[in-house]
């Protein structure tokens, strides 16, 4: 069982990407399980993903990076024992610190694949302007293996370039992918990256 | 909300959520296109009210509407023109379930609750709907003082 995180700040397009990736990976023959963590006690995202025909394990009531890491551990053990998927896609809350989740998963001896962090190009100025948000989002970006510049269909080339430079300064080692899930840009690149690490195992 | 489920991570400071689930109904049937209009107006109303209360950023406002044959979901990041509504309208109904989740940066948890409830009540009233009381929940996400931390 391999695990991939699709992380990123609130509203960056995680759920839409999880649906798109899951469709593609399932079509290629991988058994995919989806684990969604939401801030609210009443899940919305999990219900939406289920509406696309996927089975979702919903962890609500707090953030798995810090508040309810124990729930993540139990849920992953359950998934491994009961469903034995090839791949678990985790969509943490928009406030989650991907590195903390990685630590929890590594402690379980589960193979962890790339951490994909979405960065919303339509809000890049705002997100990197307010001190608290900047600290959170910079931490998320630092933990990324791939940074997906999301919603590029809604902004100009200049804005994309500016966002790309901003995230590169924070995490120069990460691969940067231009993503428009709605238009399909970048989805195949990410699916291939995920598929390669999953098949390696 | 259990106290030990509150986040103490300073990176989460200033972000609060409020979730509500309710049954909405009226005598006159509600067609699918009106459900879509309801969802859109709810998104605009909640985000506008949160900004009015002083929100700096709309983390997200998300909702779904569930009827016997339909399932619509809506979200916004606060720009009035940027409301997404997807899903199936289904048959006309006299009642439906609404789940609404607001995650807001820059106002207190009580203000998130008040703004969301105020906008929800206004939208419900505008569509002539009545709401069956379901206990709302405030989700506090940051508590600066210490305590158990299971991460």
Task: Annotate the PLM regions.
Chain A
Residues 138, 142-201:
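Canonical P-loop GTPase G-domain recognition
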Residues 2-7, 12-129, 135-137:
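Nucleotide-state-sensitive switch-loop elements of NTP-binding domains
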